[in-house]
């Protein structure tokens, strides 16, 4: 898969999700299914969207003991998603177990991406809430390195860190970047953001965009604007 815009379908129900996606006549955008929608609708929402032709990033951010994550990933691998993720803070052994569980008997598997630090986290929150005193960019690079050592395909990171991740882990190591907003848009609860054009320039491989598309007066037009700015 090449560069792409992933729409964060952070809706509460299947009905809302399908009503939104029905607006994209003739288009099958890459979509992210997060906790709210997955927990509300279960695995069937993944099957339904796959049947409609969408690529899917299943964003559940697993973080548990290695054996539990391994077994959970073995279940998720049967859903035929295109990408899924976990928290890099779960350690290298957890990530290795996840990769093993996700790999099917024929050797195929979805892309596995590690979350470094959430884009809602800034230096102050990291120091005060998590008692991590290192600079946030150093923590992100450390987590990215660990994910690379574990054999993962890439990381979720702020677009501010995508270039450094490629420098640290190589150009083929994927960067999936939320925290993307239009220059004339509201940044919401994100702390570390860039525009689609800036994310392209700095080297992001995928951008995850939610409210700037889903809450737009014309979501299709907003999606096309994202694609124009990011993919060209």
PLM region spans:
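Hydrophobic faces of well-ordered beta-strands that scaffold small-molecule active sites
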Residues: 3-9, 31-33, 56-60, 84-86, ...
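Short, acidic/polar
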Residues: 12-24, 67-75, 134-146, 191-198
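Structural motif
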Residues: 26, 52, 79, 150, ...
């Amino acid at each position: 898969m090449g560069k792409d815009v992933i729409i964060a379908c952070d809706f509460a129900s299947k009905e809302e999700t399908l009503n939104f996606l029905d607006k994209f006549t003739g288009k099958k955008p890459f979509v992210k299914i997060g906790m709210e929608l997955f927990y509300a609708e279960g695995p069937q929402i993944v099957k339904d969207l796959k049947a409609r032709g969408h690529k899917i990033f299943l964003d559940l951010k697993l973080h548990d003991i290695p054996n539990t994550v391994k077994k959970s990933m073995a279940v998720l691998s049967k859903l035929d998603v295109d990408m899924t993720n976990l928290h890099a803070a779960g350690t290298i052994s957890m990530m290795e177990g996840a990769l093993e569980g996700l790999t099917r008997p024929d050797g195929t598997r979805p892309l596995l991406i590690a979350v470094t630090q959430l884009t809602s986290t800034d230096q102050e929150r990291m120091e005060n809430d998590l008692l991590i005193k290192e600079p946030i960019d150093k923590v992100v690079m450390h987590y990215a390195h660990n994910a690379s050592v574990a054999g993962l395909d890439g990381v979720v990171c702020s677009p501010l860190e995508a270039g450094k991740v490629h420098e640290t882990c190589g150009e083929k190591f994927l960067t999936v970047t939320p925290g993307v907003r239009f220059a004339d848009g509201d940044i919401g609860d994100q702390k570390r953001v860039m525009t689609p054009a800036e994310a392209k320039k700095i080297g992001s491989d995928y951008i995850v965009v939610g409210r700037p598309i889903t809450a737009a007066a014309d979501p299709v037009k907003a999606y096309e604007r994202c694609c124009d700015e990011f993919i060209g």
